[in-house]
Amino acid sequence: MEVANATQQKHFVLVHGAGHGAWCWYKLKSLLESSRHKVTAIDLATSGVNPKRLDEVDTLQDYCLPLLELMAAIPQDDKVIVVGHSYGGFCIALAMDLYPKKISIGVFIGSIMPDSTHPPIYFFNQYYEWNPDGDDSPDTKVETYGCPDQPRTVIHFGPIYLSTKLYQNCTSEEIELAKVLVRPVTLFSEDLSKLKAFSEEGYGSVKRGYIICSEDKAFPVGLQHWLVDNVGVSEVKEIKGADHMPMISKPQELCQCLVEIAEKVV
C-alpha cells in the first residue's frame, strides 16, 4: 500500500463493537501503520483488557468513557478520524456530538448510525425490526443481574453464534481467537431509551462515512443500505465478501476503504 507522506498522515481512532476490544483491530492497525498513519485502538469499559465489570457501568457514556477521555486529551488543533464498528457506532456518534471540532469524519462499519432527529433508541429498535431474531442462537445465553426492580440484561455470545453470524468468512484460527477473547455484553437499552437525539450542531456538523459489509449475517445488509439512504453520508464504500468482522476477514480491503475516505477529508 502507498506510504503516506507527512501531509497525508491521518490519525485513526478505532472503536470496537459489543463484546470485542482493541484486539480485533490487530490486522488493520498494522496495515494502517505500515502506511505511516497513526492508529489508536481502544478498549471501551468492560471490554478487552479494560478492568471494569458490567455491574460498574450503568450508561452508554460510562461505557464510552475511555474514548471520551482520549478525545478530551487530543489537542484542540488536531483532528482525528473516528471509526466505529457495529454497536461502536453509538460510541463514535457520542464522541462526534461532544467533540465535533476534533473529528474530521466519523466512519461507520456494519454499524448503527444515528441521525440528529431521532433518539438513539429509534435506531436500536430499527436493528431488531430488520433482524427480529436479534442475537438469538442455540448457544447465546441471555441473563439478568442487578436489582429486581431494575434488572440488567447481559448477553454471552456462544461459539456457534460467533462462527456462523459474526466470523463466518474468517479462518478457524481467527474464530478460536474470538472464542477466547470476546466478553459478555450489555447493550444499555434502558439508558438509550432516556437519551435525546444527538445534536445537529455537534454530531450533525461532522462528516459521516459508511462501509457496507456485503455478507454480514449479524447486522442486516438491508439495514446498512437503509441507514446510508435515510441518515445520509458523504462517503460510502462496500466490501464484497465481508462478514460482520471485515477487520479480520477483509483487512486489506477495509484498509483501502479507510485510506480512500481519509484522502478526501481535511
Curated annotation (Swiss-Prot):
Q: Which InterPro entries match?
A: AB_hydrolase_1, AB_hydrolase_fold, MES/HNL
Keywords recorded for this protein, A-Z: Alkaloid metabolism, Hydrolase, Serine esterase
Q: Name one GO biological process term.
A: jasmonic acid metabolic process
Q: Where is the AB hydrolase-1 domain?
A: 11-121
A Pfam family that the UniProt record links to this protein = Abhydrolase_6
Q: What is its EC number?
A: 3.1.1.123
Which positions are catalytic residues? S86, D216, H244
One annotated GO molecular function? methyl jasmonate esterase activity
Q: In which pathway does it act?
A: Alkaloid biosynthesis
Tissue specificity, please? Mainly expressed in roots.
Query: Catalysed reaction(s)?
Result: 17-dehydropreakuammicine + H2O = norfluorocurarine + methanol + CO2
Question: Assembly and interactions?
Answer: Homodimer.
Instruction: State the family named in the UniProt similarity comment for this chain.
Output: Belongs to the AB hydrolase superfamily.
Q: What does this protein do?
A: Hydrolase involved in the biosynthesis of curare monoterpene indole alkaloids (MIAs), natural products such as strychnine, a neurotoxic compound used as a pesticide to control rodents, and its pharmacologically active derivatives, including brucine, used to regulate blood pressure. Curare alkaloids act as animal glycine receptor antagonists. Catalyzes the conversion of dehydropreakuammicine to norfluorocurarine.
Fetch the PANTHER family from UniProt.
Answer: METHYLESTERASE 1 (PTHR10992:SF1083), METHYLESTERASE FAMILY MEMBER (PTHR10992)
What this protein is called in its record is Norfluorocurarine synthase 2
